Amino acid sequence: MTPEILPIEQYDDQLAEKTERLRGMMAPFNAPEPVVFRSPVSHYRMRAEFRIWHEGDELYHIMFDQQTKQRIRVDRFPAASELINRLMPELLAAIQPDSVLRRKLFQIDYLSTLSGEVIVSLLYHRALDEEWQEHARALRDSLTAQGFRLQLIGRATKTKICLDRDYVDECLPVAGRDMIYRQVENSFTQPNAAINIQMLEWALDATAGSTGDLLELYCGNGNFSLALARNFERVLATEIAKPSVAAAQYNIAANQIENVQIIRMAAEEFTQAMQGVRQFNRLQGIDLTSYQCETIFVDPPRSGLDDETVKLVQAYPRILYISCNPETLSHNLQTLSETHDIRRLALFDQFPYTHHMECGVLLEKRQ
């Protein structure tokens, strides 16, 4: 696989290999057969980052080969959305003749949406002044005139300049309802929008007919908690990153959802609060004891759940666990399977043509 050529003809074989690998990893836990969700074979990534190479008067996107560390020129990138592919040549064509915009530009980040918006972040090894802003505004205006709905951001050491705003609003069709999600530049968002929709719909199906409330740890911009809110009386969700919490609060209002409460704290802190070990000012006005959380949802980082959080999670009758690293999931399941059975297993091909796997399990406590 090169950045410009995807081995599309190998997609089915690669997905079959991942499915087999997941089966093997989940076999010790008596997991059911995985339901497999395919990715689009191209234009599936909603974001991309490129280094910028300067050669004489020319300017082009590059990536580095992970094995050889050689640089590879990238003029088109079929893994990324069609919107990013349309924008890449137009953006460089506009920057190339402009000495102010190109000077010490070393990286460009793209974040696009299915709703047709895109954020472009230009990263520099120099201070950005008023002259840069003037040229950047002209660049934004010329690309807008070409039909691109874009936000332009300049970054340098300890500097972030937004010409307008640093977010885009995504709209995802989820089980018959359009969900609005504000996505903030440089914050985590699911990279594969088509797979994200399938993950949300799978989670909705897995929790259909639920009783009581839902607790979610690591909620990000509310991706799962807002979609799942329709299946529960109330949802209590935690997140540590300030921009994500702000986006989640906006998303609650934009989707007119009234049964979701977001708390800004780490999962480890929340564990202490639930156990009564510590009191937090941030929890004033929130009566944790009033929540009847019978289901807990976790979508942890690659490192998985720490031991204390595993113990917290184990107390709940139903656990919905989305994992971007089945190895740490397996490690967590060694403890969780002492008390819970896996009722559902899913493989989401979030990262085609790589060895990475995303999967989901629904666990229920043994009676």
Curated annotation (Swiss-Prot):
Keyword NADP attributed: no
Cited Pfam families: tRNA_U5-meth_tr
GO biological process, one term: tRNA methylation
CDD domains named among the record's database cross-references: AdoMet_MTases
InterPro entries associated with the record: MeTrfase_TrmA_AS, MeTrfase_TrmA_CS, SAM-dependent_MTases_sf, TrmA_MeTrfase, U5_MeTrfase_fam
Keyword Membrane: no
Active site: 324 (nucleophile), 358 (proton acceptor)
Enzyme Commission code: 2.1.1.-, 2.1.1.35
Catalytic activity: uridine(54) in tRNA + S-adenosyl-L-methionine = 5-methyluridine(54) in tRNA + S-adenosyl-L-homocysteine + H(+); uridine(341) in tmRNA + S-adenosyl-L-methionine = 5-methyluridine(341) in tmRNA + S-adenosyl-L-homocysteine + H(+)
Top-level lineage group: Bacteria
Gene Ontology CC annotations of this record: cytosol
Enzyme class: transferase
GO molecular function: rRNA binding; tRNA (uracil(54)-C5)-methyltransferase activity, S-adenosyl methionine-dependent; tRNA binding
Keywords: Methyltransferase, S-adenosyl-L-methionine, Transferase, tRNA processing
Residues annotated to bind S-adenosyl-L-methionine: 190, 218, 223, 239, 299
Family in the record: Belongs to the class I-like SAM-binding methyltransferase superfamily. RNA M5U methyltransferase family. TrmA subfamily.
Function summary: Dual-specificity methyltransferase that catalyzes the formation of 5-methyluridine at position 54 (m5U54) in all tRNAs, and that of position 341 (m5U341) in tmRNA (transfer-mRNA).
Protein name: tRNA/tmRNA (uracil-C(5))-methyltransferase
Gene: trmA
